Amino acid sequence: MSNAKNTSAASPARKGHSHHDPASDEFRKEDFPFYWLARVHGRYTQNMERLLKKIDLDVPRWRVLWILNENGESSISEISTHAIAKLSTITKIVYRMKEDGLVDTAPSPEDGRVTQVRITEVGLQNIERMQEVTRELFQRSFKGLTEAQVQRLNRMLEVVFHNLETL
């Protein structure tokens, strides 16, 4: 066996030429969509936590209230699916919210093992308060983008989301 073969066998094979593929020699983090998704999510979460703290709420409660506001009465499992969170995590959040009077729970009439959650009047009042304190953040987030661009961004992110379901 020649020395050249041993050297080439020990060295990694030439990788692709994509700036957005971390396995590529040409990779640049600024061209990697997940780099920007992580940064946007981090900044968004920091801002949301800061704003919601003013009204004694947090992002998990905000998420549950919005899911219930949009979907109406939902099971804890359905909330977990929409929130992309573990069932045990959402269960804890829902029961803390129940203690705070934001939601009510009841067994499902169809299946007593399923817990249904509905928003209370206090929860609805908190949605109004959440809208007031976060309005500027959402307006500023999409400044410089047209409605069509925001819709296109949503469609592209939805495709990526569904692509990741099959892993």
Curated annotation (Swiss-Prot):
Remaining remarks: Transformation of P.putida KT2440, which cannot degrade IAA, with the iac gene cluster confers the ability to grow on IAA as a sole source of carbon and energy, but not the ability to chemotaxis towards IAA.
Region ranges (Disordered): 1-25
The protein's name in its UniProt record: HTH-type transcriptional repressor IacR
Species of origin: Pseudomonas putida
Residues in coiled coil: none
Keyword annotations from UniProtKB, A to Z: DNA-binding, Repressor, Transcription, Transcription regulation
Domain of life: Bacteria
Keyword 4Fe-4S recorded: no
SMART domains noted in UniProt: HTH_MARR
